[in-house]
């Protein structure tokens, strides 16, 4: 079977339904490359053999040497043809692989686009705006509740702030005065001089009058 017959099918058989897949075509091209590479190795060996035969016969058997060189030329021609065919097949395989890669990429991108569209089917910009507004309202409400909970409660104890501030200022002033007094020390007050002579005692007459008054008081108390 020829190379192209193996590649495209022989005998005009029916192609598979829908044609071959890119993976199948790529695999066939690789198989063909492998077959041609083996053919190359075979021809290279034949060329080497014919060259050896031509050298062996040399001038001893000129006719055999010429025949060996002719076969060598035919093998070299076939080898050159196979080299060209391999280059073409490699180019085709690479192009098909790139096309298959692009197809897979586009297929996956389309699949992702459909998934994204399905995710957005039940969603529009108005609903998104409404949802974000609801979230903002709930956050604001949560902050108000947190503020209300954390605010101290007097439980009926109401005080005049101005009165409390005045009392606090008074206490601060007292503390300041006390500190200043401690820094400056107590003020020294001069004491009177001690008299150098004895003080006169009470007059005797005045003492007698006081004794009479005491007796009179005692008599009055005893008569009752």
UniProtKB/Swiss-Prot annotation:
Residues carrying Phosphoserine: 184, 223
Gene Ontology cellular-component annotations: amphisome membrane; autophagosome membrane; cytosol; endosome membrane; ESCRT III complex; kinetochore; kinetochore microtubule; lysosomal membrane
Chain spans, region Intramolecular interaction with N-terminus: 154-224
Modified residues (N6-acetyllysine): 6, 114
Modified residues (N-acetylserine): 2
Function: Probable core component of the endosomal sorting required for transport complex III (ESCRT-III) which is involved in multivesicular bodies (MVBs) formation and sorting of endosomal cargo proteins into MVBs. MVBs contain intraluminal vesicles (ILVs) that are generated by invagination and scission from the limiting membrane of the endosome and mostly are delivered to lysosomes enabling degradation of membrane proteins, such as stimulated growth factor receptors, lysosomal enzymes and lipids. The MVB pathway appears to require the sequential function of ESCRT-O, -I,-II and -III complexes.
Domain notes: The acidic C-terminus and the basic N-termminus are thought to render the protein in a closed, soluble and inactive conformation through an autoinhibitory intramolecular interaction. The open and active conformation, which enables membrane binding and oligomerization, is achieved by interaction with other cellular binding partners, probably including other ESCRT components.
Name recorded for this polypeptide: Charged multivesicular body protein 4b
Origin species: Mus musculus (Mouse)
């Amino acid at each position: 079977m020829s190379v192209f017959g193996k590649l495209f099918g022989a005998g005009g058989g029916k192609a598979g339904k829908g044609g071959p897949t890119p993976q199948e075509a790529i695999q066939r091209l690789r198989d063909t490359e492998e077959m041609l590479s083996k053919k190359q190795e075979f021809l290279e060996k034949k060329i080497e053999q014919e060259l050896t035969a031509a050298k062996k016969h040399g001038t001893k058997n000129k006719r055999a040497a010429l025949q060996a060189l002719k076969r060598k030329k035919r093998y070299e021609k076939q080898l050159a043809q196979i080299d060209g065919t391999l280059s073409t097949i490699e180019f085709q395989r690479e192009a098909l692989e790139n096309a298959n890669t692009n197809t897979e990429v586009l297929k996956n991108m389309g699949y992702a686009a459909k998934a994204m569209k399905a995710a957005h089917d039940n969603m529009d910009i108005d609903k998104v705006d409404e949802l974000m507004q609801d979230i903002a309202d709930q956050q604001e409400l949560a902050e108000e509740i947190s503020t209300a909970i954390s605010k101290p409660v007097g439980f009926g104890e109401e005080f005049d702030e101005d009165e409390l501030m005045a009392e606090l200022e008074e206490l601060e002033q007292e503390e300041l005065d006390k500190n200043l007094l401690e820094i400056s020390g107590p003020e020294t007050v001069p004491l009177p001089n001690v008299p150098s002579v004895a003080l006169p005692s009470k007059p005797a007459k005045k003492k007698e009058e006081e004794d009479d008054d005491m007796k009179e008081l005692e008599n009055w108390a005893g008569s009752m």
